[in-house]
């Protein structure tokens, strides 16, 4: 739990993206997945809302949780393994974790940097999109 708060204390950046995702996997996740894979790698947190008007990073992020973590994880795996959505799956089992914070479940996805031999990572069968 403390690790998530430490991560959030620095705010969103090139290696951290937060998404509300209370009811499911947002389509914007895949743009972030490919961007992280093609650069430095990074962490995507589902179930966390960023309040852009808040300057204080300790108050800027709100843990809202996801409604059905198991379903979201299943959907994530199904989609990342679909060549129609993303050209390569870089994730291993340990890269997707469900974390309980104050009774709310968030999902942390660690996207590794893609090896140069498999870059660019792209989405929707479109080399010019999501790279």
Language model features by range: what are they?
Residues 1-131:
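Conserved N-terminal catalytic/coupling substructures associated with nucleotide/phosphate chemistry
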């Amino acid at each position: 739990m403390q690790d998530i708060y430490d991560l959030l204390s620095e705010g969103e950046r090139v290696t951290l993206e937060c998404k509300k995702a209370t009811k499911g996997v947002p389509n914007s996740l895949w743009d972030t997945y490919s961007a992280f894979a093609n650069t430095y790698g990074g962490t995507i947190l589902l179930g966390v809302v960023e309040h852009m008007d808040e300057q204080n990073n300790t108050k800027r992020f709100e843990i809202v949780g996801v409604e059905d973590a198991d379903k979201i994880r299943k959907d994530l795996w199904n989609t990342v393994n679909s060549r129609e959505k993303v050209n390569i799956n870089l994730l291993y089992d340990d890269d997707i974790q469900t974390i309980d914070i104050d009774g709310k479940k968030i999902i942390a996805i660690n996207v590794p940097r893609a090896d140069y031999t498999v870059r660019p990572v792209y989405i929707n069968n479109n080399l010019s999109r999501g790279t």
